[in-house]
Each structure stands twice: as structure tokens, then as C-alpha cells.
């Protein structure tokens, strides 16, 4: 029987102090403009906080309001993919009661039950809120806090910085957030920007696969045997998932293959000279393209291709001339992808991001997940307890049926529910 969801309230949380008129217009960078208007969505599951429901809500409301003073663009409204009007209209906050124990959600291997904890209609951004929060209460006393942040104001790193600052403000009343809001100071605003060509589909399913630490080490050893030096966890897991996705695509296409491209978002903060701090907020990333011919399906070669494509991001200058040239190169690649001659896959890694440090005052989360995506052929990687990696994979139904039964994949990963 499906869990019953009951809405308790819906309101808007505004900054506790008004944003100065001098900060009213927050210009989008070229990266902000290029990103499709979607939400970055995360849900954090906790056992019973051990305090009254009204106190939890008051604590979250007050701390969010104070945090928004420093993250003032998050409480504004997007204007014509050009800038954010920092008008303090606020963040949408929904509170619901889910009539089932939290364990009923965590035991699922599909995304259906998990999706209950996310606000309705957050597959694409609302015009009325760049951030949407949903507080979920369960029969057992446990709670889940879902946070959806528009990709127009932050990438994954910036979104998690905001959530951790909010949690720290709730936990320690003296905490003062100190985000570095980059706006268009690093990546200049462009008059004409091509969006990343996401492929949306209503026939997608999302499954989560967990790679234990020991199996990741086996994958790394396999890559080393083929000549790849010091492969990373993300490189080997991504390569295996990509290989299995290509095999699933071929099995559903009468054994025929098409050229494909893997688009990876690369966090530029550590690569820039000088590097940007973790509290930098904006879309501070570039796109890594790995184009694969139809006969290049072996894991070692895929891992090597991913490494080679990433090397170009070493020791980047923050000079405008460099970024302009990169945007021109990116624009040409996007034009090729928009021809429809490639199968396009996407991968975003949130590994090593402090998602399990989000403590609102009642302990760290027992489980963190993301929402079912409507972007087909999408892979999101996230750390899981015990040095594991959780992969949230979104494919069309027929392709997923082949993918989730791939023996190679299942020899390293499990179709998994939360512990």
C-alpha cells in the first residue's frame, strides 16, 4: 500500500534583514546562463530529533531566514535568464506528514517512495521560488528535509555549502555564513549562450546502485593493470556505469551501436590558479566531453578516456581571455551534440562533498538521496556511509531493464536500499 501524504502548511521564508538596494541586481554568469532551469535536489533523513514538532519547525524557519541574509540571491526571482532580482520574495517552505515509518522509504530500491519526500513539481524550476524546501514528518518520529535549489544560482558544491550553512545556523546560534557569491565576476555574462542539451523524457526510471569500498578497489586494480596510473574512485565507477549503459543501449537497438558522448560537470574550484574556496557559490564548473566510437566499449579504455579529458583542467587561469576561448570551444561542441548524431549521457559527481555533515542540531543524517530525474541517461554519484559510492542512474524503462540485470555491473555493485 502506498504511503499517504498530508500537507500541513505551505509558506515563504524571507531573509531576516532586507537586502540593500545596491545588491538588488545579481548578474548571471555565462555558466549560470548555460545551465537548463532545473533544481539540484537532495533529501536528508534523520531519526527522531527528540523534541516537539513545533520547536523543530521554528528552529528551521528562524535559521533559514537568517541564512538567507547572506545567500540573498536564493530568496530572489530569476529575470529572463539575465539576472536575479534580489527582492526578498523568499524561499518556499512546505511541511507534510507521511503516514508510514521512515524505514518504509529507506528499504525501497526504486525511487517512487523516496520521491514522496520531495516537493511536487520540482523537476523544473518554479517561477515563484529559486529554492523549495519540504519538511517531512513520519509516523515513527523521524524526519526528512528535502531541499531543491535552482541550478541558476548554484552548482552542486554551492548548493551543499548553502545547506550546511543553514544547518550550522540552526545548530549554533552564533554561526555566521560567509559565502563567496561570484555572480559574473569570474565567468563573464554572455549575450548569446547555448544551453547544455539535456534530453528530457517522461518514460524514465531511476535506480540506485551501491558500490562497496572493496569492489571499488577491485575496479581500480583492474584499471591499473591496463596502464592507468592512480585511478580515482569516481573515474572507475563512472567508466563501468558508462560501459554498462552503452551495452544496454545496444541490446535495445537490435545489437546496433551509435557514437556516444559522456558529458561530465567538472568542479573548477580546485583547478583554478589561485584555487577558489569551497564556500564559493555559483556555477563554477566546466563541461568535460568524452566522445566514444561505436566499438570502444571496454572498461579500461573508457577509464583512460575520462582521465585524458580531465587533464585539460589542470592549472587553469582565471583570466577572462581563457574563459572566453573555452566557451567558444564549448559552444562548438554543443552545436555538434544538438545535431542528434550522438547518444548523450550525463554524469555529475557529488563525491567528497560534505552531504553527511548536514546537522541541524539533532545529529547527522542516516541517509542522503537525490530525486528521480526526468533527464534521461543521467548518472549522479554520491558518497555513502562506509566509503561506498551510491550511483543514482536514470534511463528509459527498456534500457534500464537491460542495465540493471547486467552481470558485469552486478559483480561490483548492488541494486540497493538504504541501510
Curated annotation (Swiss-Prot):
Its main location: cytoplasm. Belongs to the plant acyltransferase family. GO terms for molecular function: acyltransferase activity; acyltransferase activity, transferring groups other than amino-acyl groups. A motif (Nuclear localization signal) lies at residues 206-213. The keyword Acyltransferase applies. It comes from Alstonia scholaris. Monomer. This is Akuammiline synthase 1. Optimum temperature is 32-37 degrees Celsius. Pathway: Alkaloid biosynthesis. It is found in: Cytoplasm; Nucleus. Pfam families: Transferase (PF02458). Its EC number is 2.3.1.322. It is an enzyme of class 2 (transferase).
Amino acid at each position: 500500500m502506498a504511503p499517504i501524504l498530508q500537507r500541513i502548511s505551505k509558506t515563504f521564508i524571507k531573509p531576516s534583514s532586507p537586502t540593500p538596494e545596491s545588491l538588488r541586481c545579481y548578474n548571471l554568469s555565462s555558466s549560470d546562463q548555460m545551465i537548463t532551469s532545473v533544481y539540484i535536489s537532495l533529501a536528508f533523513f534523520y531519526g527522531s530529533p527528540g523534541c516537539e514538532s513545533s520547536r523543530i519547525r521554528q528552529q528551521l524557519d528562524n535559521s533559514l531566514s537568517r541564512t538567507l541574509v547572506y545567500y540573498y540571491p536564493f530568496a530572489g526571482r530569476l529575470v529572463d535568464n539575465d539576472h536575479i532580482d534580489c527582492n526578498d520574495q523568499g524561499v518556499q517552505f512546505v511541511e507534510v506528514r507521511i503516514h508510514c515509518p521512515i524505514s518504509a522509504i529507506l528499504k525501497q530500491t526504486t525511487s517512487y517512495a523516496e520521491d514522496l519526500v520531495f516537493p511536487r513539481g520540482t523537476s523544473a524550476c518554479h517561477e515563484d521560488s529559486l529554492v523549495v524546501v519540504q519538511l517531512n514528518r513520519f509516523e515513527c518520529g523521524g524526519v526528512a528535509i528535502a531541499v531543491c535549489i535552482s541550478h541558476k544560482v548554484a552548482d552542486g558544491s554551492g548548493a551543499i555549502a548553502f545547506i550546511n550553512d543553514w544547518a550550522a545556523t540552526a545548530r549554533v546560534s552564533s554561526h555566521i555564513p560567509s559565502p563567496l557569491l561570484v555572480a559574473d565576476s569570474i565567468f563573464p555574462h554572455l549575450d548569446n549562450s547555448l544551453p547544455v542539451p539535456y534530453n528530457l523524457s517522461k518514460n524514465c526510471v531511476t535506480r540506485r546502485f551501491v558500490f562497496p569500498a572493496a569492489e571499488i578497489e577491485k575496479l581500480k586494480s583492474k584499471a591499473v593493470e591496463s596502464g592507468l596510473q592512480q585511478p580515482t574512485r569516481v573515474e572507475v565507477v563512472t567508466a563501468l556505469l558508462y560501459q554498462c549503459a552503452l551495452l544496454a543501449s545496444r541490446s535495445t537497438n537490435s545489437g546496433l551501436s551509435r557514437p556516444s558522448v559522456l558529458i561530465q560537470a567538472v568542479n573548477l574550484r580546485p583547478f583554478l590558479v589561485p584555487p577558489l574556496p569551497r564556500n564559493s557559490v555559483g556555477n563554477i564548473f566546466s563541461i568535460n566531453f568524452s566522445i566514444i566510437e561505436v566499438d570502444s566499449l571496454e572498461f579500461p579504455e573508457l577509464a583512460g578516456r575520462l582521465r585524458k579529458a580531465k587533464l585539460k583542467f589542470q592549472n587553469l587561469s582565471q583570466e577572462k581571455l581563457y574563459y572566453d576561448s573555452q566557451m567558444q570551444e564549448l559552444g562548438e561542441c554543443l552545436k555538434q551534440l544538438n545535431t542528434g548524431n550522438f547518444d548523450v549521457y550525463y554524469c555529475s559527481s557529488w563525491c567528497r562533498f560534505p552531504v553527511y555533515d548536514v546537522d541541524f542540531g539533532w545529529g547527522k543524517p542516516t541517509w542522503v538521496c537525490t530525486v528521480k530525474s526526468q533527464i534521461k541517461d543521467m548518472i549522479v554519484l554520491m558518497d555513502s556511509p562506509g566509503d561506498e559510492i551510491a550511483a543514482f542512474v536514470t534511463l528509459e524503462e527498456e534500457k534500464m531493464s537491460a542495465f540493471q540485470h547486467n552481470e558485469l555491473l552486478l559483480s561490483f555493485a548492488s541494486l540497493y536500499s538504504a541501510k
